[in-house]
Amino acid sequence: MITTSMTRTSALDTDMLGMVPMVIEQSGRGERAYDIYSRLLKERIIFLVGPVNDQMANLIVAQLLFLESENPDKDISLYINSPGGSVSAGMAIYDTMQFIKPNVSTLCTGLAASMGAFLLAAGEKGKRFSLPNSRIMIHQPLGGAQGQASDIEIQAREILYLRERLNAILAERTGKSVEEIAKDTDRDNFMSADAAVTYGMIDKVLATRA
């Protein structure tokens, strides 16, 4: 069995997502209630909050595809506050971001760590942002393997492949060399929002709305 992830313990409890505020809209046909995330989806805003897992990836991918079908020429905003998580789930989101026609703008609100940071950098260049006090962290994939020696060897090769693939993509997104990325992700590498701009993870720090 192989478990490959890019994650860190988060103060965010995804169970809290069950406590979602409702908003009421008035129209000529009366009142309509939305949960706040559905209402913001109408404004083409998607939230990636909490660990990146298969369930989260399916929701994000579905929302990206839906918004593309609604208007393929209008930007989508992806707000990220995540400690990271599954590499395969994160790559599903990444590939969909690159696949769809609309540009995807990313914004870090709080924490973008590990796979969360990878997805932050995956936004359209020139449209990757962070709030001033957010933190960004990059590191190499974490893996846990068990079983007989030959199985562990196979799993180790897969983790090394994923590390090389992630490093290559991050190098392209940041303008760094693969060697620099490999060195800088050898251990947890935390950055301030301003440092993330310098590194090439994001393009601008937003203190207020323009």
UniProtKB/Swiss-Prot annotation:
A family per Pfam:
CLP_protease
Protein's GO biological process: protein quality control for misfolded or incompletely synthesized proteins
Q: What is this protein called?
A: ATP-dependent Clp protease proteolytic subunit
What family is reported?
Answer: Belongs to the peptidase S14 family.
> What gene is it encoded by?
clpP
Highest taxon, organism lineage? Bacteria
State how it assembles. Fourteen ClpP subunits assemble into 2 heptameric rings which stack back to back to give a disk-like structure with a central cavity, resembling the structure of eukaryotic proteasomes.
Spell out the subcellular localization from the entry.
Cytoplasm
Query: What's its EC?
Result: 3.4.21.92
In terms of CDD domains, this protein maps to: S14_ClpP_2
Question: A cellular component term (GO) from this record?
Answer: cytoplasm
* Catalyzed reaction equations: Hydrolysis of proteins to small peptides in the presence of ATP and magnesium. alpha-casein is the usual test substrate. In the absence of ATP, only oligopeptides shorter than five residues are hydrolyzed (such as succinyl-Leu-Tyr-|-NHMec, and Leu-Tyr-Leu-|-Tyr-Trp, in which cleavage of the -Tyr-|-Leu- and -Tyr-|-Trp bonds also occurs)
Keywords associated with the record: Cytoplasm, Hydrolase, Protease, Serine protease
Report the main location listed first in the record.
Answer: cytoplasm
UniProt xrefs under NCBIfam families = clpP, PRK00277.1, PRK12553.1
Q: Which GO terms describe its molecular function?
A: ATP-dependent peptidase activity; ATPase binding; serine-type endopeptidase activity
The catalytic residues are: S114, H139
InterPro entries xrefs: ClpP, ClpP/crotonase-like_dom_sf, ClpP/TepA, ClpP_His_AS
Question: Looking at its record, which EC class is this enzyme?
Answer: hydrolase
Q: What does this protein do?
A: Cleaves peptides in various proteins in a process that requires ATP hydrolysis. Has a chymotrypsin-like activity. Plays a major role in the degradation of misfolded proteins.
